[in-house]
Amino acid sequence: LENLERVVREVCTADVEPDGMVFDPTTVKTERIKEDADYEGVRVRFVGLLGKARVAMQIDVGFGDVVTPGAVDITYPALLDFPAPSLSGYPRETVVAEKFQAMVYLRTLNSRMKDFYDVWLLARQFAFDGSMLAKAIAATFANRETAIDVAPIAFTPDFTEQRSTLAQWAAFRNKLPNAEAC
């Protein structure tokens, strides 16, 4: 944890072209992600300042995941007239595979409504190569030692019509600016 904290503090103080955003290295804190004890991860939180506005920042770092078909360069859109940042990250197939694995693994205990929304949104915004997506799902399930269920409970009325699921979905939707779309 201390090493990752040190690295993020260094990044916060990196000399970059001024864009109005300043990261406060004294606010960097790390904690182990405990959502699922089977997987190792660290959450890093810190504060960014945009003028007088405080912006809560969070980075989740996972370890030991398989990335299929491999890391990709992702160019993020810039809000201001600055060069768009480019980072290496998970391909969409791996993102979907990990979220789908969590849906299957957690069964009726799943409270991660954002995963369902993310998969829905990705499916609407991007075309997927079915065979590559299948490879990513197979690799993720194998790495996480999860059996592929042909009829995941997360897609049945036993889950979707549970009072707790409906309440969690309604609460999640209320946080979205475009809640009526889903």
Identify the meaning behind each predicted range.
Residues E2-C182:
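Structured mid-to-C-terminal alpha-helical surface segments
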